[in-house]
């Protein structure tokens, strides 16, 4: 394991030059202190977890110190926000400190969010507040633990720096990690500003560093776009299968790597609600839970438009046509597994759709239903779950279909079925009310709840002794919370 001063930097994006980013130094926080750190994320940098408790850790990730090899840059990009094009966005409060490569040869971006004003801050102050930083940290690590591709979070650093939002809050910084911070909006920026040389340089950078296997294909850029389409179809299938609502699927929040990126007013479903809107600024429901699937395709089409200098329109349309079939196949496979099924039948999609319709009409907890379905043999499990439903006749009909489907699935033992279902159906998810409780404690100076919640969520499929309160339905006040974008 390494100490902080032993990290090895290789700042490949910074070498693209000033057309792609601007050199900016972080603005230090007052009295920086560790709120929470992720040992799993630290391991990706080969860092000894104990260094998180040292003063220099808070100073480095609180903007007071920099590695000599770091090259902090604010990236420029644009994007479609709620369907309308915004010509210039960029890192308004975040800095790419540099790229570190570990002993396995992996490169990781170190991106400091809340690092102060940049040329792209527009009307903002360049700061992030403690509550939004905690939410991003918890979500990044929780999604990774669920097997959902996501950026990672190394730590949150709190402070005494005052920041004004709807009220005065305390500033914080979160250190985000990813193999790249390039977004769909990077390509849109150079396309719409008519900078073909930079557009080509960016495309080569992404192809060579992040999709090198596509270089061997007859049409490398088309192969790369197809891979991006496939990754996004798989990602959004996992969002839908696990009830994750992103909240702000603007193209500047879409990673070129097909990972969950830029956490804002996100939420996991409590009761199943296909039309749930987690962002209270989304008045028309553009980014509602059920709309995430078509919006994913819309965003890919926006990226495709920006790639027309390199790829023919017909080829792009053909690649975009892969998205929905790939999404549907991935989603149905995940839902079969959540139902404990190991084989495929033609009517499985109808079985899933009928269940979700019943859950919607009865307000059934999405996560706990699937977990409890695997606790006992199918016949006993559906009997115990029956009382959660209002339409008893409808549920009874579904239960008979499900039991017959399980019977046809094979002669696996109940122990195997239970282990299989518990391996894909989490007991613990990041419910908004749990995050809110942890944030309230942290804002009063007690970081123990944030750390405990992070620890629980790092093992979402394992029953953890003494942690029953994290595996319960939310109280009435905690259901379907809508979250502000102000962060």
From Swiss-Prot:
Belongs to the SELO family. GO terms for molecular function: AMPylase activity; ATP binding; magnesium ion binding. Pfam families: SelO (PF02696). Nucleotidyltransferase involved in the post-translational modification of proteins. It can catalyze the addition of adenosine monophosphate (AMP) or uridine monophosphate (UMP) to a protein, resulting in modifications known as AMPylation and UMPylation. Its cofactor is Mg(2+); Mn(2+). The keyword Signal does not apply. The active site is at 252 (proton acceptor). It is an enzyme of class 2 (transferase). Mg(2+) binds at residues 253, 262. InterPro entries: SelO. It catalyses: L-seryl-[protein] + ATP = 3-O-(5'-adenylyl)-L-seryl-[protein] + diphosphate; L-threonyl-[protein] + ATP = 3-O-(5'-adenylyl)-L-threonyl-[protein] + diphosphate; L-tyrosyl-[protein] + ATP = O-(5'-adenylyl)-L-tyrosyl-[protein] + diphosphate; L-histidyl-[protein] + UTP = N(tele)-(5'-uridylyl)-L-histidyl-[protein] + diphosphate. This is Protein nucleotidyltransferase YdiU. It comes from the Bacteria. It comes from Pseudomonas fluorescens (strain SBW25). ATP binds at residues 90, 92-93, 113, 125-126, 176, 183, 262. Its EC number is 2.7.7.-, 2.7.7.108. Keywords: ATP-binding, Magnesium, Manganese, Metal-binding, Nucleotide-binding, Nucleotidyltransferase, Transferase.
